[in-house]
């Protein structure tokens, strides 16, 4: 799926996801260098589903 024709895999970067409302870093994930990650996840601090943006 993420492999190229030569069998090598593209480099991925580890990022944290921070809640847009309370800025709490709740999740860690990986992404391709050219992507911008923004996901709707459950925030334990806010106790609701909010948008989480990537942080380094």
UniProtKB/Swiss-Prot annotation:
SUPFAM superfamilies: Zn-binding ribosomal proteins. It comes from the Bacteria. GO terms for cellular component: cytoplasm; ribonucleoprotein complex; ribosome. InterPro entries: Ribosomal_bL33, Ribosomal_bL33_sf, Ribosomal_zn-bd. One of its GO terms (biological process) is translation. Keywords: Ribonucleoprotein, Ribosomal protein. This is Large ribosomal subunit protein bL33A. It comes from Sorangium cellulosum (strain So ce56) (Polyangium cellulosum (strain So ce56)). The gene is rpmG1.
């Amino acid at each position: 799926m993420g492999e190229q024709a030569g069998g090598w895999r593209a480099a991925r970067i580890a990022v944290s996801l921070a809640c847009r409302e309370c800025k709490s870093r709740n999740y860690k994930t990986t992404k391709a260098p050219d992507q911008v990650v923004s996901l709707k996840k459950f925030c334990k601090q806010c106790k609701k589903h909010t948008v989480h943006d990537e942080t380094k």
